[in-house]
């Protein structure tokens, strides 16, 4: 049985022909198809080819993912292992780009997973370390910072 193919074009002009089942992981494309707005090629102006190829790779692995009710624990474990390896090979900047693209594509599974990866990465980091990771300038004076620490002492594990 042959599957319908969908042609996606990235913002930098790369074309990707994927199965419709994979494309249906992206709700923006589902809505385009339902509204008959999906022409010969679907342009994705906010996603580069490099990022789109990674997202498609992830979507292909998840096209037949077991549901929450599914009893196949081995399949779930294998997919979780693949997911972990997928994220491990990416740097933080690429994960940020994937989050933005997954949000644009409305690909909830990847958006949640990539966001959780970033959350896990910054967990147990000091405010200074988080500022460095995200390139955030500290606009508090030392006095203001001390006052905030006193007001919220219960949140700090010091």
Curated annotation (Swiss-Prot):
SUPFAM superfamilies: POZ domain (SSF54695), Skp1 dimerisation domain-like (SSF81382). Gene3D superfamilies: Potassium Channel Kv1.1, Chain A. It comes from the Eukaryota. Residues 99-157 are annotated as: Interaction with the F-box domain of F-box proteins. GO terms for biological process: auxin-activated signaling pathway; jasmonic acid mediated signaling pathway; protein ubiquitination; response to auxin; response to jasmonic acid; ubiquitin-dependent protein catabolic process. The keyword Nucleus applies. It is found in: Nucleus. PANTHER family: SKP1 (PTHR11165). This is SKP1-like protein 18. It comes from Arabidopsis thaliana (Mouse-ear cress).
